[in-house]
Amino acid sequence: MTDEQFESCMLRMANGDRQALREIYDAYLNLIFAVIYNTIRQREEAEDLTSEFFIKLYGLAASYRSGNGHRKWLTVIARNMTIDRIRRLDREI
């Protein structure tokens, strides 16, 4: 997906278009899961976080600003969510 296509999907999502989320999900599910799994190394947690990621992305659609490459932006969000989860799990131990 190009930056322009991604930006279009984010704009559509900001206007309530769930099909746009499906397009991003189909394009980036494997990438996001890989980023999360490679950080947390627990399949079930990675699956949960991947689902949470796309829910969060839908909520971020209206505030998305293009410019720095959407793939990097997506992976930073996924990695930060994973690190937050690891910290929360460590506190529970």
Question: Residues of each region from the PLM?
Answer:
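Structural recognition of an alpha-helix C-terminal capping motif at a helix-to-coil junction
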Residues: 34, 48-55, 59, 68-80
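Hydrophobic/aromatic residues within well-ordered alpha-helical segments
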Residues: 24-28, 32, 78
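Intrinsic, short, N-terminal disordered tails of RNA polymerase sigma-factor systems
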Residues: 1-11, 23
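Charged, alpha-helical scaffolding/interaction elements associated with membrane systems
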Residues: 12-15, 88
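Arg/Lys-rich amphipathic alpha helix in sigma70-family domain 2
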Residues: 62-66, 76-93
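Short, charged helix-capping/linker segments at alpha-helix termini
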Residues: 14-23, 33-52
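Residue-level signature of the cytosolic catalytic core of signaling kinases
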Residues: 2, 66-67
